[in-house]
A protein has these predicted regions:
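C-terminal accessory nucleic-acid interaction domains of nucleic acid-metabolism proteins
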Residues: 1-22, 29, 40, 44-45, ...
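Long, well-ordered alpha-helical scaffolding segments within enzyme catalytic domains
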Residues: 31, 137-156, 183-198
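SsDNA-processing nucleotidyl-transfer enzymes
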Residues: 1-4, 34-126, 130-133, 137, ...
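Short, conserved phosphate-binding/catalytic loop or strand-edge motifs used
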Residues: 162-172
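Catalytic palm subdomain of template-directed nucleic-acid polymerases
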Residues: 171-183
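Flexible loop/turn segments at secondary-structure boundaries
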Residues: 17, 57-60, 70, 135, ...
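Short beta-strand
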Residues: 51-53, 117, 158-164, 205-209
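Nucleic-acid 5′ end/cap handling module spanning
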Residues: 138, 161, 174-177
Length: 294
């Protein structure tokens, strides 16, 4: 297969990776090839962790930090110091690399919140809103709206996306000098403030037994050693859903109506949304904002 002048060896296109829907490896590769123009800017320069599903979503998966040694010579890497020593991470700089990653059955792509050249400086503050049953994504929408209101009081813009799984994620772009030593305490303080304001609906503590019927505002992802699923990444669910940027009007509608059926997007729907709206997450890449004092 030739992708923008790069030659790739592609195999097992008919292999079913999502057994409930029959979605194949070939369709995964096609999705990533088509979404690449929009997705690659969100991956470019960032150390990338792959979550690979060689036998599909119903079978075992594994996370791969170290870029495979059998990679094509045109796949770029970045060496990053970690608790395990230096690791050469893949960098997804172009469509060909994204297609190669898909060929590895890396359904989920988890980039760093910072680019490799400025690894100590996250470009965003990220909040992962995770519902504890019977709470659901509607409850996440309501918490996301509270986050937006809180940030607006600080003069900050934020952007929402589905996780592609059970919840929502809210990103506050920074693209400046902030370090993780600032963003993580800030995120924790915001989560605790929301919990204080709505103790029956929000929890900020890590203990899972505290989450029943509440939305866990996970602030802990704001860490140099952690990653968050990329916007437009597929997820390993029963259907090939993807982490999808949302209009705030969609979040508001779900919070008001009590139903979030319209906030679940499979691969084809994501491509249609890009055709209609463009990249709703584009401002996250460039908007420069400063952290306020809490």
């Amino acid at each position: 297969m030739n992708v923008e002048g790069r030659t790739l060896s592609i195999s097992n296109l008919g292999k079913v990776l999502y057994p409930d829907t029959g979605f194949t490896k070939g369709e995964v590769i096609d999705y990533y090839a088509r979404v690449a123009e929009t997705m690659v800017p969100h991956l470019s320069g960032r150390p990338l962790t792959l979550r690979r599903f060689p036998n599909g979503v119903a079978e075992k998966s594994f996370f791969e930090k170290r870029c495979p040694s059998h990679r094509p010579d045109w796949v770029e890497t970045a060496s990053v110091e970690t608790s395990e020593g230096p690791i050469d991470f893949c960098l997804c700089q172009d469509r060909a690399t994204l297609v190669w990653v898909a060929q590895l059955a890396a359904l989920e792509l988890h980039p760093s919140l910072s680019i490799a050249k400025r690894i100590d400086h996250p470009t965003v503050v990220a909040f992962d809103l995770d519902p504890g049953p019977p709470a659901d994504v509607v409850d996440c929408c309501r918490v996301a709206l509270r986050l937006r209101e809180l940030f607006a009081n600080f003069g900050l813009e934020c952007f929402a996306k589905t996780s592609g799984s059970k919840g929502l994620q809210v990103y506050v772009p920074l693209n400046g000098k902030a370090r993780y030593e600032q963003t993580k305490p800030f995120a924790h303080a915001v989560a605790k403030l929301l919990e204080k304001q709505s103790p029956d609906e929000v929890v900020s503590k890590m203990k899972k037994e505290l989450r029943k019927g509440k939305v866990f505002v996970d602030w802990s992802q704001n860490d140099r050693a952690k990653t968050t699923v990329s916007v437009y990444s597929l997820r390993a669910r029963e259907q090939p859903t993807a982490s999808t940027p949302l209009l705030w009007a969609e979040v508001e509608a779900a919070g008001e109506s009590g139903t979030a059926e319209d906030l679940r997007f499979e691969a084809g729907a994501v491509l249609e949304r890009i055709s209609e709206h463009g990249d709703l997450f584009a401002p996250v890449l460039e908007l420069e904002q400063d952290l306020p004092d809490l």
